[in-house]
């Protein structure tokens, strides 16, 4: 494991009080609708989606803090944590937090901005980490993107072949999360929520043959408020129970509908 960056000073907010300035902006909220979509309608969709995402991310942060009780004495790992802004917004300490990601550029930002330790992942089947190395492992909206080697999956147009690749990769990823964690919190969007969260298209996009999915996502990427690659496979509640048999499954709801699934081992 390669830790980088010196420890930063303790933040001003306290655990249990998520910092909205840090966690309240989804990555795509600033996307600009193309000229093919009326600007007013595009802006409305963008604001609505950003608001719902902010609400869910805030409630998720509280659930994480309330159920796992992460502390300054815990070794904490965020798998797929990118630049580290999410945990930086909800945890008041830095020196015991590590961000793991495949992108070295975001790891540099996580280290230099927040003083987090970093682990470079290479996309291989096994994490470069010891068994039960971390007291707490956090992983949000990542496992649905673990569908196989990046240089292979975009060339797969057959639905059954892609599903087989994705199931195997997701099972391995879940096993690695469980292997390195004493306690964990793993969240993923629910397959049957009315709006598919990556494309912001109706959920039936995930039920179409993969060949059609690729074409539609490519088309809407040029004429819609979001651009997304066809690298994801959303999970069901049953699948999450199978992937994390030692966890409690908690359902995040929005407007009464299941929006995300969270596997918690406290």
Set out the residue ranges of the language-model regions.
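Conserved N-terminal segment of class I S-adenosyl-L-methionine
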Residues: 2-132, 136-140, 256-261
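A short beta-strand submotif of the Rossmann-like class I SAM-dependent methyltransferase core
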Residues: 139-142, 148
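Helix-to-beta-strand junctions that scaffold the AdoMet/dcAdoMet cofactor pocket
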Residues: 146-147, 181
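Conserved class I S-adenosyl-L-methionine
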Residues: 150, 169, 183-211
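A short glycine-rich, Lys/Arg-flanked "PGG" loop and its adjoining helix->strand segment in the class I
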Residues: 158-183
